[in-house]
Swiss-Prot record:
Broad enzyme group: hydrolase
UniProt domain tr-type G: residue ranges: 10-201
HAMAP family in the cross-refs: EF_Tu_B (MF_00118_B)
Stretches for region G1: 19-26
Binding site for Mg(2+): T26
Organism: Bartonella bacilliformis (strain ATCC 35685 / KC583 / Herrer 020/F12,63)
Family to which this protein belongs: Belongs to the TRAFAC class translation factor GTPase superfamily. Classic translation factor GTPase family. EF-Tu/EF-1A subfamily.
Function: GTP hydrolase that promotes the GTP-dependent binding of aminoacyl-tRNA to the A-site of ribosomes during protein biosynthesis.
Protein name: Elongation factor Tu 1
Stretch list, region G3: 76-79
One GO molecular-function entry: GTP binding
Amino acid sequence: MAKSKFERTKLHVNIGTIGHVDHGKTSLTAAITKYFGEFKAYDQIDAAPEERARGITISTAHVEYETDQRHYAHVDCPGHADYVKNMITGAAQMDGAILVVSAADGPMPQTREHILLARQVGVPAIVVFLNKVDQVDDAELLELVELEVRELLSKYDFPGDDIPIVKGSALAALEDSDKSIGEDAVRLLMSEVDRYIPTPERPVDQSFLMPIEDVFSISGRGTVVTGRVERGVVKVGEEIEIVGIRPTSKTTVTGVEMFRKLLDQGQAGDNIGALLRGIDREGIERGQVLAKPGSVTPHTKFKAEAYILTKDEGGRHTPFFTNYRPQFYFRTTDVTGIVTLPEGTEMVMPGDNVAMDVSLIVPIAMEEKLRFAIREGGRTVGAGIVSKIIE
């Protein structure tokens, strides 16, 4: 049994299972909890609760477990559409993924799509579990499937030759039938996950960035901007940049307040007010960010991967075409952008996920993996992620 208390002493890593429908993602998730956490049966995981992220409803199951080295938060989704939505909205951030492939079927369409999505949304590392090996009698056939999986991973720019592939049977692990492909395989899988999936950098160790939510003018003191520090640390007296919407400018933080108390610094997760030197109330606005100088730049053109809501999800009722002009909601503000669809894609239907080029009418502080909502008059009609910056 895992300890019930959440021990902060271990490194925390977020992972998830991905792969084709019925290849055994949920069974594997259940099997991992059996040996490394508080056992959750298949039915408990499969009945995933609905949650909302960026105005989109997604069913996601969360389980947690721990190895000797790490504490894991693990996400498993019941349906393919939930995976697409989850990965694009970042509802459950993934530091790495376990790709489940049935040895009996080999890679299938959703295997490919999940690998592509993992690449587009920047999942840093993948470990493979080749499931249902007891259904394949021929060792050569098993080798062939492994080769296919490696080639597919390489095709989408993952290091296919180096990725650990563990062969086993989630069912054998759950039923205690064959230890070598059951329990032993699940334990080996987790030791490979420990070894191969890198420890994420903690937000507080990254470069300072704070999206501006509000701007106030305090007589005799100057201009205060408020927001939640997304990452890094800002200390009183430090020089920072104001990026996005207008030309980038520099200023000094002369004070940091939280809950009406003065602090000497604000850090990732804190809701702060920052007093800025020599900036007037009109010179700064919501939608800009405060950032460590040189760490983030403003851009207007980018490639994105997006999911478009269905009518039932509250989205559009009709398709859209190239030159579609919705608002793109980045962090704290809406910016109008013009969509260009890829060659060969004539239109996008509600419920589709699509790669597209976007050109914003004003620049936004942007980097790859930044997420956004697509809105029409304040109503969310889609969600996306920046896959590549063009200019």
